[in-house]
From Swiss-Prot:
Protein's organism: Bacillus cytotoxicus (strain DSM 22905 / CIP 110041 / 391-98 / NVH 391-98)
Gene3D superfamilies per record: 6.10.250.660
Coiled coil residues, start to end: 34-72
Any single GO CC term annotated in Swiss-Prot or TrEMBL for this entry: cytoplasm
Protein name in the entry: Cell cycle protein GpsB
Annotated GO biological process: cell division; regulation of cell shape
């Protein structure tokens, strides 16, 4: 997990003591910067926990969906042989319609 790779916690940063030298850093500036880092770490930690929980939930849902799909009855898929019957029927209907149009309107078309 990623939490194993993180070396510092917000508490570690808060409790860190720096030695000061003769012309060392300004303590207030260091403290303010460390406070910002602590807040960021806390936000990152909360976000990480939420994402891990969401990831676990989504994995559970995926497994449930897989199980449901495996247990659901398989729908039959129409075979390609069934489709030519429909196209033949449509062709027959179109031919009949054409013949009827010729019979009814045929004489008027040529006038």
């Amino acid at each position: 997990m990623i939490s194993d790779k993180i070396k510092l916690t917000a508490k570690d940063i808060l409790e860190k003591e720096f030695k000061t030298g003769m012309r060392g850093y300004q303590q207030e500036e260091v403290d303010k910067f460390l406070d910002m880092i602590i807040k960021d770490y806390e936000v990152f930690h909360k976000e990480l926990e939420q994402l891990q929980q969401q990831n676990a939930r989504l994995k559970r849902e995926l497994e449930e969906q897989k199980l449901a799909a495996a247990q659901a009855p398989q729908q039959t898929i129409p075979t390609p042989a069934a489709q030519p019957v429909y196209s033949n029927t449509n062709t027959d209907i179109l031919k009949r319609l054409s013949n009827l149009e010729k019979a009814v309107f045929g004489s008027k078309l040529y006038e």
